[in-house]
């Protein structure tokens, strides 16, 4: 399709008539175009309403009427052809749209007329503005200009974005028909573009409004652009008039707002107005490049344009519309959607009025209309400026209210920053730390005050029972708290009955007696007398320390320090009695887990370590002392004493760590590192060959292995062994026993008959 549309030799299928015939048959082309346009509208019924279809047809008719002032047939043919061009090219470029399927039929019908008529007649109409007698030269220019337009329009078709509206007003008007595909939330912005469309009498603008979410800026941008398209249509060419304002921009008094700046402003407004659209960034970039290319391509056509006054008029109006769009973008960035919608609707109305005035001034070619047009546009811009200021004020007021209510905007992020600042220090940004939200301390104080007031007003004792206010404690609650504090020290009797009232007294008395006995033994040892006080008290101590219900109480009361006194050596460096050491080490093993603070303050660890390292200590006592030391030190190093929960790998690692250093070296291979057999077998590590470094050309003496084999090898004959074991365990089965009994009975029964006795003694049982 592109090759057919964009061929520069003006021949599509050979059915195209000469340019002069097209001029003569302009009305026929117009009728065909209106049919095709309505067909394309019906083809896009999925995206556009019937009202939009009627709007387009009315717009076409009005555009033809407005342009008939100079060249009736050429203008009608041109307008219709340019419109049909718009319908064809966007459909081809937007190959994804649903209209693409329907466009080829209408395209094939009107291709010759539309392609050649639009290009040639556009140029004719340009020249028609200057003089009606130059139409023959126009046909010559049409070929070259059609090539220029073709070069521009392939760019449009190649980029399937919504930006083609820029490269040509025709594309802008009809590329938005396929864009209705994209329209997902047309409800919000549809009314605005439709108002401007009905006023501007431009059929494509409803379509531009249909390209909502991604085109939502573009309804506005296409309004500013469609301001140009109606003028072009009034001036009998859409593709020609777009370069006219842009080329005149370079010559105008406001050169800084040339095509590039206009497109950039429109792009900026699009960025601001529609940040939600994902494709807006890519579209804007494409628009920039296409607009610049179009402006470069259309500069050649500027010589064909009519008076400079007509150029300056659409140029200034477009600049005003661009200013409005820039302000709209600022509004939508600063203000909320309501203010933006109001200003946009008014801007659309202003654009619509500007479009009407442009159609009139293009038809009349009068400078007075241009001046009135500019003044009307300036009035709309002034109104939009006031609206923008009001929207900005409203948005600033709303932002202040939000800050007063919810604190700063980044309050949620400040929590993490505050945490990091508390942990790692201040961040260094003093300005960011101006937190206007609520302080947690103030909130807690307000809560406490309100709760106090509620507690005073109400008769309930909920807060008092929770222990929040100690001033209101009753005698009963004080007694309960005292009981609860004492409950930790009391233990139940073995039978689970009543509390032992004298448990604490018994435990404390026992500890006092133990300390006294240890002190007396030290004094007797200093006097060179036998120290027998501990031995005499040992049975009583062992009896009480073995009671399960008193063990916790003993530990809490400080029995560990008393045991340390009993296990520590006497002043003459002699160990206490062997019986005392054995009994107390056994009791220490039976005691529940002891806290690190208790071990530290009591000093029991030093006493046990002294026994563990003492050369005269018995082997059994050393083993018990070593187990105690290991058990008490495991929590300090974060190790668990539950070996059942350990995996096999953990147990192997533990055994390797506890292995003596010499055996560990030998088990790992000694000084000579040995190759891993698995690596050798898998091929990762190749076996050494003669000539390789490290190869020894001699036989090796096999060395005994010092490794501890932890994993038992699997038994390969499990089934046979199980059968054998089962048979050996069960022995003779009941069936075998019954069979033997049966055979015995039969033998006996046989022997009951008469038996021939051999005289010689044969068959005699021995």
Curated annotation (Swiss-Prot):
Residues with the Phosphoserine modification: 27, 54, 69, 157, 170, 172, 183, 196, 198, 209, 211, 222, 224, 235, 237, 248, 250, 252, 261, 263, 277, 280, 295, 306-307, 309, 321, 343, 345, 366, 368, 372, 384, 386, 408, 410, 412, 427, 458, 460
Keyword Transmembrane: no
Bias (Basic and acidic residues): 44-67, 85-102, 131-144, 176-197, 267-320, 371-380, 392-406, 646-657
Processing after translation: Phosphorylation increases its interaction with PSIP1.
SUPFAM superfamilies linked to this entry: Conserved domain common to transcription factors TFIIS, elongin A, CRSP70
Keyword Transcription: yes
SUBUNIT field: Interacts with SUPT6H; binds preferentially to the POLR2A-bound SUPT6H. Interacts with ALYREF/THOC4, SETD2 and PRMT5. Interacts with HDGFRP2. Interacts (via IBM motif) with PSIP1 (via IBD domain); phosphorylation increases its affinity for PSIP1.
Protein name as it appears in the record: Protein IWS1 homolog
Organism: Mus musculus (Mouse)
Lineage: Eukaryota, Metazoa, Chordata, Craniata, Vertebrata
Gene behind this protein: Iws1
């Amino acid at each position: 399709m592109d090759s057919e549309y964009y061929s520069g030799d003006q021949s599509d299928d050979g059915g195209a008539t000469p340019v002069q015939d097209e001029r003569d048959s302009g009305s026929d082309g117009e009728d065909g175009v209106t049919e095709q346009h309505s067909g394309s509208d019906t083809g896009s019924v999925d995206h556009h309403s019937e009202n939009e279809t009627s709007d387009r047809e009315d717009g076409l008719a009005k555009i033809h009427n407005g342009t008939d002032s100079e060249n009736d047939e050429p203008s009608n043919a041109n307008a219709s052809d340019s419109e049909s061009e718009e319908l064809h090219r966007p459909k081809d470029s937007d190959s994804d749209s649903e209209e693409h399927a329907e466009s080829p039929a209408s395209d094939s019908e009107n291709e010759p007329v539309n392609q050649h008529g639009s290009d040639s007649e556009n140029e004719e109409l340009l020249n028609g503005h200057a003089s009606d007698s130059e139409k023959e030269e126009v046909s010559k220019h049409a070929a070259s200009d059609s090539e220029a337009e073709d070069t521009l329009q392939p760019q449009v078709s190649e980029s399937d974005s919504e930006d083609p509206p820029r490269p040509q007003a025709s594309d802008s008007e009809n590329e938005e028909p396929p864009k209705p595909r994209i329209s997902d939330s047309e409800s919000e912005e549809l009314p605005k573009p439709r108002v401007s469309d009905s006023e501007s009498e431009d059929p494509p603008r409803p379509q531009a409004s249909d390209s909502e979410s991604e085109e939502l800026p573009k309804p506005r941008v296409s309004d500013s652009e469609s301001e140009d398209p109606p003028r072009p249509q009034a001036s009998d060419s859409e593709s020609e008039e777009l370069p006219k304002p842009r080329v005149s921009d370079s010559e105008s008094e406001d050169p800084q707002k040339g095509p590039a700046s206009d497109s950039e402003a429109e792009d900026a407004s699009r960025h601001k107005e529609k940040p939600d659209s994902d494709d807006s960034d890519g579209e804007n970039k494409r628009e920039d490049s296409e607009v610049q290319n179009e402006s470069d391509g259309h500069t050649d056509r500027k010589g064909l344009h009519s008076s400079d006054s007509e150029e300056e008029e659409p140029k200034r109006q477009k600049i005003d519309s661009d200013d409005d769009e820039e302000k709209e973008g600022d509004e939508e960035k600063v203000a909320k959607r309501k203010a933006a919608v109001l200003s946009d609707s008014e801007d659309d109305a202003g654009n619509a009025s500007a479009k009407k005035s442009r159609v009139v001034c293009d038809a009349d070619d009068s400078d007075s209309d241009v001046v009135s047009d500019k003044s009307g546009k300036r009035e709309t811009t002034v109104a939009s400026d006031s609206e923008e200021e009001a929207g900005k004020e409203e948005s600033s007021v709303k932002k202040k209210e939000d800050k007063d209510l919810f604190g700063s905007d980044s309050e949620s992020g400040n929590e993490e920053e505050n945490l990091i600042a508390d942990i790692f220090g201040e961040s260094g940004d003093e300005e960011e730390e101006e937190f206007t939200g609520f302080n947690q301390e103030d909130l807690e104080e307000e809560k406490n005050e309100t709760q106090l007031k509620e507690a005073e007003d109400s008769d309930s004792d909920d807060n008092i029972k929770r222990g929040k206010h100690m001033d209101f404690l009753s005698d009963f609650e004080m007694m309960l708290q005292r009981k609860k504090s004492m409950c930790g020290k009391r233990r139940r009797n073995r039978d689970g009955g009543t509390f032992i009232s004298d448990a604490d007294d018994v435990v404390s008395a026992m500890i006092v007696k133990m300390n006294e006995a240890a002190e007396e033994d030290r004094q007797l040892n200093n006097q060179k007398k036998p120290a027998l006080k501990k031995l005499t008290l040992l049975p009583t101590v062992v009896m009480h320390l073995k009671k399960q219900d008193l063990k916790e109480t003993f530990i809490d009361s400080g029995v560990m320090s008393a045991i340390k006194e009993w296990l520590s050596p006497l002043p003459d460096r002699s160990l206490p009695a062997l019986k005392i050491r054995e009994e107390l080490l056994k009791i220490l093993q039976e005691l529940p887990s002891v806290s690190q603070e208790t071990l530290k303050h009591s000093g029991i660890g030093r006493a046990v370590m002294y026994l563990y390292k003492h050369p005269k200590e018995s082997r059994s006592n050393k083993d018990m002392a070593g187990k105690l030391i290991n058990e008490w030190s495991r929590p300090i190093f974060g190790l668990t004493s539950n070996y059942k929960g350990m995996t096999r790998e953990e147990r192997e690692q533990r055994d390797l760590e506890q292995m003596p250093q010499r055996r560990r070296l030998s088990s790992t291979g000694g000084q000579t590192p040995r190759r891993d057999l698995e690596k050798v077998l898998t091929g990762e590590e190749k076996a050494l060959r003669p000539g390789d470094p490290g190869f020894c050309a001699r036989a090796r003496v096999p060395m005994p292995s010092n490794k501890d084999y932890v994993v038992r090898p699997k038994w390969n004959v499990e089934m046979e062994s199980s059968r054998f074991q089962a048979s050996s365990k069960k022995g003779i089965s009941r069936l075998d026993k019954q069979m033997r009994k049966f055979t015995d009975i039969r033998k006996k029964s046989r022997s009951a008959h008469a038996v021939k006795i051999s005289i010689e003694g044969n068959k005699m049982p021995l």
